[in-house]
């Protein structure tokens, strides 16, 4: 739909549309109808004083969570801000969270737990918000709601611009994983990281029937992709898991240019 409204759109514009709307048709139409067809315009529209998006996250969830909504909102805000392990979240909130995390995952289907590919234990778990819109809403609107209350929307945009590159890098990974699942070309798709977090592989996609596996590095800009480092990380993966050593192995970079 973006080319219809902006024939000169860039990959960054497309990335922004996906990040802010999650591809939800209603949200996409709101952006287009408001004339927000570039990354800058979309950011401004997302946090505008009369923006529908400012209240949407709260309207979606506050009744569902009931009286405990503030605690659930804080957990989701921390996950959206990059605190993705139970230990990290508990150290900030100073409470035991297993019950809340279980409900967010199983009852509300708002978060999912991820473990490194082929890990057999429940250690090294990371949590993610599944809905792209809610992820960005908690990351910026809820977290910095106090800025919106005093009309400091321009200041909030500065905050968003500062962290936008890092934030959308993770969104880009999710985009490519979703596309790979849609392609039905692979029997296994996952990420991998070691216990210390020193070696991390963005995407591993394998076809067990064809005995093929591709290790992917995802970067916003193609110039930042380093396949040499990716191969080194794959060696750590082989040593840690013992998997895919006899497969036909490939290494590939993905960037916004591949969207």
Spans of features found by a protein language model:
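Interdomain hinge/linker elements that couple catalytic modules in large macromolecular machines
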Residues: 1-139
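A cross-kingdom feature that marks ATP-driven nucleic-acid transaction machinery
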Residues: 117, 124-259
């Amino acid at each position: 739909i973006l080319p219809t409204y902006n024939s000169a759109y860039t990959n960054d514009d497309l990335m922004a549309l996906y990040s802010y709307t999650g591809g939800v048709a209603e949200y996409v139409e709101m952006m287009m109808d408001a004339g927000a067809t570039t990354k800058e315009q979309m950011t401004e529209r997302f946090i505008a004083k009369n923006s529908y998006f400012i209240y949407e996250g709260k309207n979606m969830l506050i009744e569902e969570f009931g009286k405990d909504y503030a605690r659930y909102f804080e957990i989701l805000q921390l996950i959206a801000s990059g605190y993705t392990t139970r230990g990290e979240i508990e150290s900030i909130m100073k409470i035991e969270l297993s019950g809340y995390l279980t409900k967010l995952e199983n009852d509300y289907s708002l978060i999912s737990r991820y473990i490194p590919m082929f890990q057999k234990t429940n250690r090294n778990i990371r949590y993610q918000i599944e809905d792209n819109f809610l992820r960005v809403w908690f990351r910026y609107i809820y977290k910095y709601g106090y800025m919106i209350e005093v009309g400091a929307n321009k200041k909030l945009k500065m905050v968003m611009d500062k962290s936008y590159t890092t934030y959308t890098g993770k969104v880009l990974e999710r985009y490519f994983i979703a596309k790979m699942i849609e392609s039905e070309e692979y029997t296994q798709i996952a990420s991998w990281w070691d216990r210390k977090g020193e070696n991390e592989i963005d995407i591993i996609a394998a076809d067990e029937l064809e005995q093929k596996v591709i290790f992917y590095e995802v970067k916003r800009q193609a110039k930042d992709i380093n396949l040499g480092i990716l191969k080194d990380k794959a060696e750590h993966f082989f040593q840690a898991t013992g998997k895919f050593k006899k497969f036909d192995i490939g290494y590939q970079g993905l960037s916004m240019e591949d969207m």
